[in-house]
UniProtKB/Swiss-Prot annotation:
Mutant lacking the gene: phenotype: Significant reduction in diarrhea in C3H/HeJ mice, moderate reduction in bacterial colonization in mice.
Keyword Transferase attributed: yes
Organism per entry: Citrobacter rodentium
Reported induction: Transcribed for 2-5 hours after treatment that induces type 3 secretion system expression.
Reactions listed under catalytic activity: S-ubiquitinyl-[E2 ubiquitin-conjugating enzyme]-L-cysteine + [acceptor protein]-L-lysine = [E2 ubiquitin-conjugating enzyme]-L-cysteine + N(6)-ubiquitinyl-[acceptor protein]-L-lysine
Name of the coding gene: nleG1
Any GO BP annotation: biological process involved in symbiotic interaction
Function text: Effector proteins function to alter host cell physiology and promote bacterial survival in host tissues. This protein is probably an E3 ubiquitin-protein ligase that interferes with the host's ubiquitination pathway and targets host proteins for proteasomal degradation. Mice infected with a strain of bacteria deleted for this gene have less severe diarrhea.
Gene Ontology terms, MF aspect: ubiquitin-protein transferase activity
Similarity field: Belongs to the NleG E3 ligase family.
Name assigned to this protein: Probable E3 ubiquitin-protein ligase NleG1
């Protein structure tokens, strides 16, 4: 997917969006919005010149000088370091990961998983989840870990990495329950026929 940047965003639209955000927030208040599938956290600090919102890999800005035009604002933002990659969409965007988590969530039962009870504990909650999701330990791993689907969804929403390997989470790492089996010899869940 291609990044959506300032060159692809009408300056007047960016001006209108950031001006609206400024009016919706009060001093020292935190909030958030979704722009092109990314959550952008907004923190308003009283300042008549600059208003910025920063999210996971995203930055929007509103530089307001009396009489400034959208073209001047565009030039100022382009000059600011780090703005060139504004509003990226990628395979690992939270929305596509959340969709994959929803697709692969299943009801956890010992009968279905055929594994020791302790292997059904989520490494995040340290409890057996009611609803679980299997996640490969890394992109090229055949080993999977069972997570509580709500906890894992929250981790993805917050921009976290894989809790065990610290690797960035990709949609291809989230596996449906019919593709995982407990391997007694290895003592963990693995991709079937691997």
């Amino acid at each position: 997917m291609q990044p959506v940047g300032l060159s692809n965003t009408p300056a007047s639209s960016l001006l209108n969006e950031t001006a609206e955000l400024r009016h919706q927030t009060t001093p020292r208040q935190l909030g958030g919005i979704r722009i092109v599938g990314e959550i952008v956290d907004i923190s308003y600090e009283p300042n008549d010149v600059v208003f910025f919102g920063v999210g996971r890999g995203v930055m929007i800005g509103d530089i307001l000088f009396p009489g400034s035009s959208a073209d001047i604002m565009r030039e100022l933002l382009m000059a600011h370091s780090g703005v060139r990659g504004i509003l990226q969409q990628q395979e690992n965007a939270p929305s596509s990961l959340q969709t994959r988590i929803s697709e692969c969530t299943f009801s956890v039962s010992q009968e279905k998983l055929q594994c020791p009870e302790e292997e059904m504990r989520c490494p995040v909650t340290l409890e057996t989840p009611e609803k679980g999701v299997f996640v490969k330990n890394s992109g090229d791993s055949s080993v999977c870990t069972l997570f509580d689907s709500s906890s894992f969804s929250r981790l993805v929403r917050d921009g976290g990495v894989h809790p065990l390997t610290r690797e960035p989470i990709k949609a291809s790492m989230i596996v449906s329950s019919d593709k995982c089996v407990y391997d007694n010899a290895k003592g963990n869940f693995v991709i079937k026929n691997s």
